[in-house]
Amino acid sequence: MIPLKDDNPTSTKPIVSYGIIGFCVLIFLAQLGLTEQELRDFTYSYGLIPSVLMGIDQLPNDLSKISPIGTIFTSMFMHGGWMHLIGNMLYLWIFADNIEDDLGTLNFVIFYFVSGVGAAMSQVIIDVNSQIPMIGASGAIGGVLGAYLINYPNARVLVLIPFGFFSQLIKIRSIYVLGFWFILQFVNSFLSSSSGGGVAYAAHIGGFITGLVLILFFNKKTKKKVFKSKIKKTKKGPWEQ
């Protein structure tokens, strides 16, 4: 099930969401110009390494470019391949604009990065000794998905459902699209191995839950605005994270 777009207009331009997408693309394009060794060094310098963050290990001096805490944020803009980047940016493009519209620019910035921190720490906690860099925006985007599920459970989302050589386009409620995504993260987290890298499913789950909690707080803070927008809009219808 691949979401393509939602039927949920906004009243403002999501400049923060566009900025995040643009910056992630620029960083990835810069990565493409690196040699294999340079890319490895770049990933270890700016990716989030659980054992380094927790003070268990230290990076060599030539790789220690910023503080371990700083890598929580730099890692959110790095991606391990085209599919990793495109998948993350697609979800951000579809779902982030409405949450940014609800929260406003500054609150959305806070929301997005706190969701990313919650996601990162969820992965770190389950494997504090890991020396594998964690990169990707999926955890922070998971927070956006959690918020969207709360604010727009009935919004219609156009999805592509592959059936072997055939595919079907249908519109379904976001609660089913995002619920399916969340369940899939849980299932995959039990099926995957943490020994050699892969996908940081715990970060996805942690980001989603963080977003759920945060949006409830922000909804109280901006209750009047969110309530109006919900009524208006729902009428119509390495470790990679």
Model-identified regions with their sequence ranges:
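A detector for small-residue-rich transmembrane helices and their helix-helix packing motifs
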Residues: 1-241
